[in-house]
């Protein structure tokens, strides 16, 4: 019986470092992520350049683990909150900019769209506390 307990304890301790790393890295409380352009309410014809702003943290490539640094993710028409214990998804609504980009050319279909920026750590997890922009609404003509 003691042998089984030791195996269970060893397995639990082995998994502990992975559980701890499954959450985002710490972020300064004064970090600010924002849109340089477009602004909330902007009406745009066709494709546009989306420009990202960040204060009190740095921008780096995905996979590079520097203190107080991360890379941008753009959420398009996303209403569900992100799970802080899972990497930010990568799909047509969750755009990754893992090369350290601070701007991107975006093509969206005509209509109203919401945009929000999220800063991800080296492994694409949101920081703790999350570093997110205000959600803005734009209209594409």
Question: What name fits each language-model region?
Answer:
Residues 17-19:
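N-terminal signal peptide c-region/cleavage motif recognized by signal peptidases
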Residues 88-121:
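Short, solvent-exposed, Trp/other aromatic-anchored flexible loops in extracytoplasmic proteins
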